[in-house]
Amino acid sequence: MSNQHILLMSNLLPVGSNISTWWNFGSMLLTCLILQIMTGFFLAIHYTANINLAFSSVIHITRDVPYGWIMQNLHAIGASLFFICIYIHIARGLYYGLYLNKEVWLSGTTLLIILMATAFFGYVLPWGQMSFWAATVITNLLTAIPYLGTTLTTWLWGGFSINDPTLTRFFALHFILPFTIISLSSIHIILLHNEGSNNPLGTNSDIDKIPFHPYHTYKDMLMIIIMTAILFLILSFSPNLLNDPENFSKANPLVTPQHIKPEWYFLFAYGILRSIPNKLGGTLALVMSVMILTTAPFTHTSHTRSMMFRPLSQIVFWTLIATFITITWTATKPVEPPFISISQTASIFYFSFFIMNPLLGWTENKIMMMND
């Protein structure tokens, strides 16, 4: 029996000795998911999915329910930390070429889409002013689909406008989708351990492995403790840091907010949507802003897996990160110059990464062959 099997038999998962802190975000995401399900359950006990009572029920949770304000704020801040962790997790995957493990990457992209849908449904539930108008604008994008659009929108709304049936089904979906996320996360982890984790060098780490426990369990615990500390610091000192002030007013279908925007973690996609002055084009760009991640495994051309030794690709990667932040920032601003042109330029840069990366991989291969 090989040493690897002996380690597995001893309940010690063999892991590459050189995986860095960037590999800790998976366990942090799992912690976030558990936190969201636990706090969400306690919130659901007291929440009322009715357009006349939803806003009041959220106020009731924060004011009257014992420790309700902690549950509500943990759930809201936890969602933001969840997305911070998942964006870092995806960026790590792009940088170190982890997308070459196709099954893991594609299951992860599916997880991201379901997570975004879950967060969107959750944002609508308090039935505040921004909740209502963000839901109206985003669901209305379905009407851009030729032939089927209007029928699909009416079906999703449960009527001819956003109303009580919409809120009820959004609550049902927001409750059930996290369980889908749990099952998909299990598949994601099983598929990962089918091949094993990669490492920063992008090389095979079979020759140099150490037991997962105690080395990586302590390393994971450190990052989880830091994340929990950040969560409780925000909760204690600035619980409304990541909330929209507009959402503290009850939804009013007769008054449109001056500037409609979703939560900060959707602003990159919303910024891309707004940068195109055409409804169908904008909707396609919005969908592609996430779906384009699925192309990464099929367009990789470099002989080197990781970007660690590819300076040209590193420049393009960090441009993508800067672009992501820029689009997020411009999406918080009104639709007026210079923000329109900044948003359009940033959107072009965002999509160009997925075109430039394979071209640079091919160029780097040529340079290496010349040096040989």
Swiss-Prot record:
Alphabetical list of CDD domains matching this protein: cytochrome_b_C, Cytochrome_b_N
Gene name per UniProt: MT-CYB
Gene3D superfamilies xrefs: Cytochrome Bc1 Complex, Chain C
PANTHER family with a match to the protein in the record: CYTOCHROME B
GO MF entries: metal ion binding; ubiquinol-cytochrome-c reductase activity
An individual GO BP term: mitochondrial electron transport, ubiquinol to cytochrome c
Function as written in the Swiss-Prot or TrEMBL entry: Component of the ubiquinol-cytochrome c reductase complex (complex III or cytochrome b-c1 complex) that is part of the mitochondrial respiratory chain. The b-c1 complex mediates electron transfer from ubiquinol to cytochrome c. Contributes to the generation of a proton gradient across the mitochondrial membrane that is then used for ATP synthesis.
Keywords (A to Z) from UniProt: Electron transport, Heme, Iron, Membrane, Metal-binding, Mitochondrion, Mitochondrion inner membrane, Respiratory chain, Transmembrane, Transmembrane helix, Transport, Ubiquinone
GO cellular component: mitochondrial inner membrane; respiratory chain complex III
Residues bound to a ubiquinone: H193
Transmembrane segments: 25-45, 69-90, 105-125, 170-190, 218-238, 280-300, 312-332, 339-358
Species this chain originates from: Walterinnesia aegyptia (Desert black snake)
Name this protein carries in UniProt: Cytochrome b
Additional comment: Heme 1 (or BL or b562) is low-potential and absorbs at about 562 nm, and heme 2 (or BH or b566) is high-potential and absorbs at about 566 nm.
